[in-house]
Swiss-Prot record:
GO molecular function list: ABC-type vitamin B12 transporter activity; threonine-phosphate decarboxylase activity
Protein name as it appears in the record: Probable cobalamin biosynthesis protein CobD
Gene that this sequence comes from: cobD
Function comment: Converts cobyric acid to cobinamide by the addition of aminopropanol on the F carboxylic group.
Organism, scientific name: Thermoplasma acidophilum (strain ATCC 25905 / DSM 1728 / JCM 9062 / NBRC 15155 / AMRC-C165)
Localization, UniProt: Cell membrane
Record lineage: Archaea, Methanobacteriati, Thermoplasmatota, Thermoplasmata, Thermoplasmatales
Highest taxon above the source species: Archaea
GO biological-process terms attached to the record: cobalamin biosynthetic process
Membrane topology designation: Multi-pass membrane protein
Assigned protein family: Belongs to the CobD/CbiB family.
Amino acid sequence: MIIILIGAIAIDIIFGEPKEYIHPVVFSGKVSKRIETYFRHHDNRIVYGSIFAVAVIVITAIPYFLAIYVSSFVLVIYVIVSMVILKTTFSISAMGDHIRLVVESLKNGNISDARVYLSRVVRRDTSNLNENEISSAAIETIAEGLVDGYMTPLFFFIFLGIPGAFVARIINTLDSMCGYKDRENFEFGRFSAFMDTVINYIPARLSWFFIGFSADVLNYRHKVISPRKYVSRFDSVNAGWPISTMACALNLRLEKRGSYIVNDEGYQPSVRDIERSMHVFYVAVYSYTIIFVLPLLVAMAFLL
């Protein structure tokens, strides 16, 4: 398991995201589009939305789990296939790739391009955001992405192996597709949103330590971090933890217009702060892996 994890991280660093035609996030999106219409055309939207979510997970998982099973007859092939599939469950370099485009646009004074690039990684409307608001949204995305895109999949990898990490990734994708509180998705996407809340609950709270620790390592941390003061301002019971911790660690005033303000007395975020947040992200990724994931994988190996 440790070799598979290290290999998966190496694949991410060297090659980045796999091609779309083998990526489970893309495949789950295609599955969703194929079957969604059928499940939405029913009165009991909560029940059928739940069945839809389970169906997407099962259908998406079949070819990947089958690939693992078939490859298991040859150890070397099994390890390589497992590395590739585990890699698809988390993202390290992809976050940097997306955020880099926003940073470069802001540095060049091209706020219109920055809004477009930001819109690819956030749910909010970016069309009228100013530079501070773009910076805030990017930093919030980095903080949340640490949990959704890395900590949670590997948390489940520790205890449930590749299937656990894989399902966690698809649940996160389902939440991003239909876990909204608008009229169309409030009932239909409720189960997807609930599953996403459950799987991220512990990793989100662990992020308090790893973001704070990483800010200390980088000599960024401004003050004692107390995210509890702000987490109640978020609709999500999980998102407030990494975002508030990042805001306090870097002493930034992060704001989603009309929704919440975190660390009210902090500085307005800038392009430089986006870069600092990415530094925290990378250190948090590797410290989480070394301090938390690897020791528990070793412990699980001895217990099982």
